[in-house]
A protein has these predicted regions:
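An N-cap/entry alpha-helix motif that binds or orients negatively charged groups
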Residues: 2-68
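Active-site phosphate/pyrophosphate-handling residues
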Residues: 3, 75, 102
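Alpha-helical segments flanking ligand/cofactor-binding loops in enzyme cores
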Residues: 6, 77-78, 105
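Glycine-rich, proline-tolerant flexible connector loops at the mouths of alpha/beta enzymes
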Residues: 26-33, 62-68, 87-107
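Alpha-helix-loop-beta-strand connector modules within alpha/beta enzyme cores
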Residues: 38-43, 47-49, 99-114
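Hydrophobic faces of well-ordered beta-strands that scaffold small-molecule active sites
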Residues: 53-57, 88-90, 113
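Alpha/beta enzyme core
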Residues: 69-91, 110
Length: 114
């Protein structure tokens, strides 16, 4: 592997292989069945009358390290929404970006924004 992107991809492939090994398709389908509402990212951007802004929620990056010391994804989401973000991009990759998949569900349960 020659660069960080290749390392991230390889790590994610390994993680997905473990998830597939430990969860049947039926189990995964049952988990997403309960997610009964979705916000359309594309429509939000296309239908926005002003400037569309995609705001990123990211605790760390492989190149810069820890970006936000007292990271609170819900507070960051609220700040972005209060400042007219059209959509939120939430990094969930754990090893390199220190994200968590739960961030998306938490934000989805608290705010109405793609």
């Amino acid at each position: 592997m020659t660069n960080i992107l290749e390392k991230i991809i390889q790590t994610k492939r390994e993680t997905l292989d473990l998830i597939k090994k430990n969860n049947s398709l039926a189990t995964l389908e049952a988990k997403i069945k309960n997610l009964n509402f979705f916000y359309n990212f594309k429509d939000a951007i296309q239908n926005n009358k002003g400037i569309s802004l995609i705001s990123e929620i990211k605790k760390a990056s492989p190149s810069a390290g820890l970006l936000v010391k007292n990271f609170n994804h819900l507070n960051i989401a609220k700040m972005y929404i209060d400042n007219k973000a059209t959509c939120l991009s939430v990094l969930t990759e754990e090893k390199y970006f220190l994200g968590k998949l739960d961030y998306i569900l938490d934000i989805k349960n608290n705010f109405k924004i793609p």
